[in-house]
Swiss-Prot record:
A matching Pfam family: DUF179
InterPro entries (alphabetical): AlgH-like
Family: Belongs to the UPF0301 (AlgH) family.
Coiled-coil intervals: none
Protein name from the UniProt record: UPF0301 protein PSPA7_0505
Organism: Pseudomonas paraeruginosa (strain DSM 24068 / PA7)
GO CC terms, sorted: cytosol
Organism superkingdom: Bacteria
Record-linked Gene3D superfamilies: VC0467-like
Length: 189
């Protein structure tokens, strides 16, 4: 019998099914930054934290007044792991002190990207989050097997061009799914 290679979902969206009980992930869409045999890492992209970039910059450099535009740049809850650490998703092409290229996207984790965004010299489009979602080896696969998530290839337009409250339904629509029509009960055929 031929063994099949595992399918990894890097650069995909995880769409929480209606029966998702974990409050960290109920009604979320998560961008998978990495997924391999060691586990997975992602950022929830539709949970505004209530903070804005100006408030974060005031904590980083209290002696410098952030530009007014920073008050309109939302910070997201990226997940329950390392919630004091920042992650910035943006289109690839710009590199900062700590940038991981992800194909057409990149993720930066150094403060210089935040100051570049504030100065108007950073990426034109970005999603800034505090914290991330992490799965140990085999954990995400088990959740997928339990029908906790739908998956689809990530779409940068959903990440950067839609308001947070539209991202979940838009990601599901990529699969032709209306989440409001799904039952909260899971099963296997």
């Amino acid at each position: 019998m031929k063994q099949s290679s595992p399918t990894y979902l890097k650069h995909h969206f995880l769409i929480a099914m209606p029966h998702m009980a974990d409050p960290n992930f109920a009604q979320t869409v998560t961008y998978l930054v990495e997924h391999n045999d060691q586990g997975a890492m992602g950022l929830v992209i539709n949970r505004p934290s209530g903070l804005n970039l100006a408030e974060v910059l005031e904590q980083l450099k209290p002696d410098v007044l952030p530009p007014a535009r920073c008050q309109h740049i939302e910070i997201y809850n990226g997940g329950p792991v390392q919630t004091d650490r920042g992650f910035v998703l943006h289109p690839s092409g710009l590199a900062y002190q700590s940038t991981l290229e992800l194909g057409e996207l990149a993720m930066s984790t150094s403060q210089d990207v935040l100051f570049a965004i504030a100065a108007g010299t950073g990426p034109e489009k970005s999603l800034i989050s505090l914290g991330y979602a992490g799965w140990e080896a085999g954990q995400l696969e088990a959740e997928l097997s339990d029908n906790a998530w739908l998956t689809c290839p990530a779409d940068p337009a959903i990440l950067f061009d839609l308001p947070a409250e539209e991202r979940l339904s838009a990601a599901a629509a990529c699969l032709g799914v209306n989440l409001s029509l799904l039952t909260a009960q899971a099963g296997h055929a």
